[in-house]
């Protein structure tokens, strides 16, 4: 049981969509007349082994959770067959899996099966319990997985999911800046996705010399993760700041201003995701793939999983194919 529980970094699974609120404060601009939230922490995501032979860069871990409520974890993953993320459970949070290259095939114990490819998104609400597998579809498979906490009154809801094709993700381009709006709003366009925990998830690409200012609701926590950057490229918050390398998390401080970013590379594009969310403000107790509010709830979750009850009824019998 513990071996399955400790496969804590699964790649997404189940998710639901509703229409997003019209949040005007989430617009963006490519002009220069803005003050940005400050950068309060930078973390370089080092390589580590995860799952069954997979490799991840863990950008957010428990040391960043207090600064980034409601976010629990961010992994940049790379996996090739026969490695992967075999059968494992979840309870109490959501996951967002964004495939950058290749494909990931998902199966769960409720009979769902599907594959998402480069540019596709899978948004999972694990709720009261899910067991699933996530395995590579092609020779090279890369992407991001974000874990988003659920409030106490939603941790035991029924799990559900849906997939969003890359062609369904709204896109905009202006002055050398392209954005893919996975959740939230930017450049006057907004995603059809509404998450249970209000969340912004934007994929920006800045050409050499381009810049962007993205507004973020004042009460939300925000961070960026840099996917690609050339020498001297990614500069955040102040145009005089030092560039930050690829595979780094940039944590922004509080404020009623948004986030400003410059690509100062002369030859290479800057690609990063900007992620922000409304804090839940509740205690977080995590045991691997289970995230609850108290230790007693974690103990009950382990018991439920072990004995196959309260959402884990299929735990003893189901195996992915």
UniProtKB/Swiss-Prot annotation:
Keywords associated with the record: Cytoplasm, Iron, Metal-binding, Nucleus, Plant defense
Location in or out of the cell: Cytoplasm, Cytosol; Nucleus
BP term (GO), one: defense response to bacterium
Coarse class of the protein's main subcellular location: cytoplasm
Gene Ontology CC: cytosol; nucleus
Knocked-out gene: effects: No visible phenotype under normal growth conditions, but mutant plants show increased resistance to infection by the bacterial wilt pathogen Ralstonia solanacearum.
Gene3D superfamilies: Jelly Rolls
GO MF entries: metal ion binding; peptidase inhibitor activity
Pfam families to which the protein is assigned, alphabetical: Pirin (PF02678), Pirin_C (PF05726)
UniProt keyword Cytoplasm, yes or no: yes
Family to which this protein belongs: Belongs to the pirin family.
Function: Involved in susceptibility to the bacterial plant pathogen Ralstonia solanacearum. Stabilizes the xylem cysteine protease XCP2 by blocking its autolysis.
Protein name according to UniProt: Pirin-like protein 2
Organism from which the protein derives: Arabidopsis thaliana (Mouse-ear cress)
Lineage: Eukaryota, Viridiplantae, Streptophyta, Embryophyta, Tracheophyta
Gene name per UniProt: PRN2
